[in-house]
Curated annotation (Swiss-Prot):
Subcellular location: Cytoplasmic vesicle, Autophagosome
Compositional bias annotation for Basic and acidic residues: 320-331
One Gene Ontology cellular component: cytoplasmic vesicle
Highest taxon in the source lineage: Eukaryota
Family: Belongs to the ATG13 family. Plant subfamily.
Protein's name according to its UniProt entry: Autophagy-related protein 13a
List of residues that carry Phosphoserine: 248
């Protein structure tokens, strides 16, 4: 705020701040307490800063044009040393029990009483002893002005926290005359509260602002409890609870909620690039927050109304159009609709065209859902992973495939993912066409497409992780790591990929699918070597050690089923057969040695 430069001294500027502080504080209190004054100054022009007087811009708090009553009150205050006392008075009716028996008033006449529920005091305290002036008098008024802004903002906030503010709001929104009203009285002096009234009042003092040679003070004395006046029983307020809201158990399920103008239909997303959006006959159902929730269910979608692969690629999973009662170029009216739904009930299905897509028969009132098969989803996989907006599916997640029953089945998926990232298809051809079907077994898709369909049978796209680095949550899924080094893979495209080895049978498969000389770092190669040395069987073992090791393997459960027991029985019988042959050979050698070492003849 720029102050006038024609003031004679710094004292004149300080007096100007105080003189503007009093009417601003009065305007704040009356605007929050008197219902007849609350409607004034609430126009759009006040919010936009248009048609605002220069005096209203003081203290960076625009309250709007002052009413005529405030203009009259502004003229009475000429001396800043006089206190300004604002009494907020509640006018309330009194019962006939309080009337005297000899009163001439009839029962039809209602008497009212006035009770002071708040008293605001704003004053400038000028000490009798003048304090010495500091040397920085040139910037003193700027500090006082900034502190005055803080004091007025505190005053503005405190007016909204006291009980009288709630009464003022109730009276301003009352539907009928209740006999209650709030009035005010402004004066330089007031009567002192009596003893019983003082016990029901509380006082709050604001931090004063030092304005040399005195200080600017503000305080409020208020009634903390207004339940004695029984305001709730006499004030008729508009209902705040909607009893016939959409989805209420008390509402008829087939009730039609009309909307003004044309019919409104809810969509999760609309068409783009000249494609018309789905009409009312398509496979969709209005959401619960639209006006047509209880309409009869529409017919299911036909194959010619489903999205094509090209349309699926052009629609990004995370981008949806939000419309608020807006009519598009095709004449359809749409409302605001979030892209994701918390449950499967209000979600609009998303279709991928294909003749072999299985459908689920649903009862009326449930959104139709199409679950795409793995072969259909593989057909529309795009190799351009650098553009996530064109890829309708999340990127490959090698770690998520480890949740499958076999840990080795996920390794070809990792190799396929890396080959697709480098632009090579498994068959040696360039994977440039999105309609090319990847030659990959369907069991590899169990981890990759785990986030596409939710448990509520509502197709949606989950937020995919970064393909270059797995999240820390996946690292916690595998606490057992037998390799002491991090397995960091750096492919030709410069992407880093971290992967931890399994305890059993994983190092050999990784060494086959990922050559160490090309993709593995030196630390990873040492880790694989240490793992191989730890898990390598001994070079020589006897039959007892072999039997003990086979029994230990059987206890661990690595061999299961009839086939494994049959192979173990064959190995035991073969060992016994070899032992029997060794015994026969030993007996034969001993018999020959005895026959050869008989008594020799002496010639």
């Amino acid at each position: 705020m720029d102050f006038p430069e024609n003031l004679p001294s710094d004292i004149g500027r300080l007096e100007q701040i105080v003189s503007h502080f009093f009417p601003k504080a009065l305007h704040i209190v009356l605007n929050s307490r008197i219902p007849s004054l609350q409607s004034r100054g609430r126009t759009r022009e006040r919010l936009s800063g248009l048609n605002v007087r220069k005096s209203d811009k003081w203290f960076n708090l625009v309250m709007g044009d002052r009413p005529a009553a405030l203009e009259k009150l502004h003229s009475w205050h000429r001396n800043i040393l006089d206190s300004m006392i604002i009494d907020i008075i509640l006018v309330h009716p009194i019962s006939n029990d309080n009337l005297d028996d000899d009163d001439d008033h009839s029962d039809s006449v209602v008497r009212s009483a006035e009770t002071v529920i708040e008293r605001w005091v704003v004053q400038y305290e000028n000490p009798l002893i003048m304090s010495p002036q500091s040397s920085d008098s040139a910037t003193r008024y700027q500090k006082v002005y900034k502190k005055s802004i803080i004091l007025l903002r505190s005053l503005y906030a405190q007016t909204r926290l006291l009980p009288a503010y709630r009464v003022s709001r109730q009276l301003s929104s009352s539907l009928a005359s209740s006999g209650y009203d709030l009035i005010y009285k402004v004066s330089s002096f007031s009567d002192i509260f009596s003893g019983p009234v003082t016990e029901t009042m509380k006082e709050f003092r604001f931090a004063p602002v030092e304005v040399p040679p005195g200080r600017l003070c503000a305080s409020v004395t208020y009634r903390s409890d207004l339940s004695d006046f029984n305001l709730g029983a006499h004030i008729t307020l508009p209902p705040r609870i909607i009893t016939d809201y959409v989805g209420s158990p008390a509402t008829d399920p087939m009730r039609f909620f009309p909307s003004p103008g044309r019919s409104v239909e809810g969509h999760s997303f609309t068409g783009r690039a000249g494609r018309p959006p789905l009409t009312g006959s398509s496979a969709e159902r209005p959401h619960s927050w639209t006006s047509g929730f209880h309409r009869p269910p529409a017919q299911f979608a036909t194959p010619n109304q489903s999205f094509s692969p090209a349309q699926s690629h052009q629609l990004s999973p995370g981008l949806h159009d939000f419309h608020w009662s807006r009519t598009d170029a095709f004449g359809d009216n749409h409302q605001l609709s979030p892209p994701f739904s918390p449950s499967g009930s209000p979600s609009t299905p998303r279709y991928i065209s294909g003749g072999n897509s299985p459908r689920i028969n649903v009862r009326p009132g449930t959104a139709p859902v199409t679950i795409p098969s793995s072969a259909t989803l593989n057909r529309y996989v795009s190799s351009n992973f650098s553009e996530p907006g064109r890829n309708p599916l999340p990127p490959f997640s090698p770690k998520s495939t480890r949740r499958s029953p076999s840990s080795q089945d996920s390794l070809p998926g990792i190799a396929l993912y890396r080959s697709s990232r480098s632009g090579e298809s498994p068959s040696g051809l360039m994977n440039q066409y999105p309609t090319q079907k990847l030659s990959k077994d369907s069991k590899y898709d169990s981890g990759r497409f785990s986030g596409v369909l939710s448990s509520s049978d509502s197709p949606r796209f989950a937020f995919s992780r970064s393909p270059s680095r797995l999240s820390s949550q996946d690292d916690l899924d595998d606490p057992d790591c037998s390799c002491p080094f991090d397995f960091d893979d750096v492919d030709e495209s410069g992407l880093q990929y971290s992967h931890s080895l399994d305890r059993r049978k994983t190092s050999s498969s990784i060494s086959q699918s990922l050559p160490l000389g090309r993709r593995s770092s030196q630390d990873a190669a040492v880790g694989v070597l240490v793992h191989m040395l730890k898990t390598a069987p001994p070079l020589r073992q006897d039959s007892s050690t072999y039997m003990a090791s086979m029994s230990g393997v059987q206890r661990e459960g690595s061999v299961s089923g009839t086939e494994s027991e049959f192979s173990m029985a064959r190995s035991t019988s073969d060992a016994l057969e070899e032992l029997r042959n060794y015994k026969q050979l030993k007996d034969l050698l001993l018999s020959k040695s005895k026959s050869g070492s008989g008594p020799t003849r002496v010639h």
